[in-house]
Design a protein with these regions (language model features):
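Membrane-embedded beta-barrel scaffold of Gram-negative outer-membrane proteins
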Residues: 2-8, 13-20, 254-266, 270, ...
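Outer-envelope beta-barrel architecture signal
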Residues: 1, 44, 52-56, 136-140, ...
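C-terminal beta-signal and adjacent terminal beta-strands/loops
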Residues: 73-74, 80, 385, 445-457, ...
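Gram-negative outer-membrane beta-barrel proteins
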Residues: 11-17, 64-72, 148-156, 257, ...
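Outer-membrane beta-barrel transmembrane strands
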Residues: 1-10, 15-18, 33-51, 57-68, ...
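Transmembrane beta-barrel strands of outer-membrane/channel proteins
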Residues: 7-9, 58-64, 142-148, 263-267, ...
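Solvent-exposed loop segments that connect transmembrane elements
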Residues: 20-30, 72-116, 152-239, 275-316, ...
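Gram-negative outer-membrane beta-barrel transporters
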Residues: 56, 136, 336-338, 343-348, ...
Length: 529
């Protein structure tokens, strides 16, 4: 038997300040992030000696990680002018109506959010595999893994964006009541009016929520940074605890000395993932959204007196996801040729989806996501000098059930960013020039068109799909004393596409993206000692 122990400690510190409005205007003056991640892991394995018809391995794994995130997000010097332009000067009108200094309160430089998020995550698992060599050509494999995962998460934000803190429904409600001589800040006057005029009061409540009656509601789109309800709190404990038993079964058969056939069935598990961003929101089961003046009804957070203006429901976390994968394949090798092919059928229940919305990230579970397809890879040494390779994945991914995504009901639609066809093809020719070992290589990377967004509205804005059709080439040599020189070209035919697209920060109806790397050429020199 062999005992193996692996102990690891890793620490990662990231500090950055991004110009995240991606314009020449100073709209977002500061988008600073500092993230610290400290991770400790311990793994122990005991493996059999390999004698006899049964091989086995048992082990355990421990994981302890702490994440601390500090963010600062402030408006820049041009943000007020930008907001005035979008609103047609309405911000100044609201400031005047509220008897505030005009031009000096809303959307000011330096207003924004100071954020603090983090989590402590501990997990452990015990696992084992057993290979039973039933005959010289048939092997059955069984694997088991039991995991427990616990997380303690937190999030707090100090918000200085005055305009986003306004309850525009309540302001419209107060203005309407004021027309009847009722002071909306006096509960006694409001109750007396409602009792004496129930029909008129109901109409005022309804009108406060109707943009046709309350024009202030048209400004809600400019409330980019609404107040945040920190957690844990008296209703939300910020904790999750998950456990699961996963397993794998595999049967392999050496049909000949050159051909192996196999079939496997496996399950997988991913624990709860917390949304550690400003878009974290209470679940609908904990909070019923709505301005207090509209009588939204009872909910745990409102009843506990925790509700803040403009709070909406959403998700604090995505619950566990569970996967099932069936694979049937063959591996063939003969002389200078090798060919592998596998059919796979994967289903993920509760797929954890994370989508950037322009001001934060929406984390939610899809009911079910699946994909079926083929994986193929082959290599052929045509001669001693020439090697050809090919690898490809051909699949049909779909959201089987995703009725409550951040982009509406996506059930039956293909997920964005996943190509139906992905291939990699290469040719390498090696040869000697006197004492030099030289080579010439070319490769082609292809990914079929796929949508940038799950959201149909954003996809319609960008107007095209992501497709990759990139050629690379290189040539080089190595000397007897270990000096290597490689001349290379990447994307030599200048394939032009957007690698990633996303909603622009605080600019509804606009999109941003990162372009592909243009044709690039260079030389790499290395020395082995």
């Amino acid at each position: 038997m062999t005992l193996t122990s692996i102990t690891a400690y890793r620490e990662s510190d990231v500090e950055q300040n991004a110009d995240s409005d991606f314009t020449s205007a100073d709209l977002i003056g500061r988008n600073y992030n500092k993230t610290n991640i400290e991770t400790f892991t311990q793994e122990v394995r005991l493996t059999s000696s390999g004698e006899g018809p049964i091989d086995w391995m048992v082990g355990g794994f421990y994981f302890d990680e702490t994440v601390a995130i500090d963010n600062e997000f402030f408006f820049g010097s041009d943000f007020r002018g930008y907001a005035d332009f979008l609103s047609g000067g309405a911000l100044a009108a609201v400031e005047g109506a509220l008897s505030l200094p005009v031009g000096l309160v809303f959307a000011q430089e330096g207003q924004g959010m100071v954020e603090e998020f983090g989590q402590d995550n501990t997990a452990w698992s015990v696992f084992g595999t057993l290979d039973w060599h039933m005959t010289d050509r048939v092997t059955a494999t069984l694997g088991l893994n039991y995991t427990e995962d616990e997380k303690d998460a937190y999030g707090n934000i100090v918000n200085t964006d005055v305009f986003s803190s306004l309850d525009l429904v309540a302001i419209g409600f107060a203005q309407a009541l004021g027309g009847f001589g009722v002071d909306a800040t006096d509960p006694a006057q409001v109750a007396a009016f409602a009792g004496a005029n129930p029909g008129a009061f109901a109409a005022i409540q309804a009108g406060a929520q109707d943009p046709a009656s309350n024009p202030l509601l048209g400004l809600q789109a400019l409330q980019f940074l609404p107040p945040f309800l920190g957690f844990p709190n008296s209703v939300e404990d910020g904790q999750s605890s998950d456990n699961d038993l996963t397993y794998t079964f595999r049967l392999a058969y050496d049909a000949t000395d050159n051909l192996n056939l196999y079939a496997s069935y496996g399950t997988g598990f991913k624990a709860t993932s917390w949304n550690l961003s400003r878009d974290s929101r209470p679940f609908a089961s904990d909070f019923t959204a709505g301005s207090p003046v509209t009588s939204p009804g009872s909910s745990p957070i409102r009843d506990a007196g925790l509700a803040v203006p403009n709070l909406t429901s959403g998700t604090r976390y995505a619950g566990p996801e569970e996967a099932r994968v069936i694979e049937v394949g063959a591996k063939f090798a003969y002389d200078a040729f090798a060919f592998n092919v596998a059919y796979f059928d994967q289903v993920i229940e509760g797929f954890q989806s994370n989508v950037f919305t322009g001001t934060g990230f929406a984390l939610a579970n899809a009911g079910k996501q699946s994909t079926q397809g083929l994986e193929v890879d082959a290599s052929w040494n045509v001669t001693d000098e020439l090697l050809l390779t090919f690898a490809g994945t051909f699949q049909d991914p779909v959201y089987d059930e995703f009725p409550n995504s951040a982009s509406g009901d996506l059930s039956g639609k293909a997920p964005s960013g996943i190509s139906d066809t992905t291939t990699s093809t290469s040719a390498t020719y090696t040869f000697d020039v006197n004492t030099l070992e030289a080579f010439i290589r070319a490769d082609w990377q292809y990914e079929s068109p796929t949508a940038y967004f799950d959201d149909p509205a954003n996809q319609a804005l960008i107007g095209n799909q992501r497709e990759v059709n990139t050629w690379n080439a290189s040539a080089g040599f190595t000397t007897e004393n270990g000096l290597g020189v490689t001349f290379w070209g990447r994307n030599i035919f200048d394939d032009d596409y957007v690698t990633v697209a996303f909603p622009s920060v605080a600019q509804a109806g606009s999109l941003s993206g990162y372009p592909s790397q243009p044709a690039t050429y260079g030389v790499t020199v290395r020395k082995s000692f």
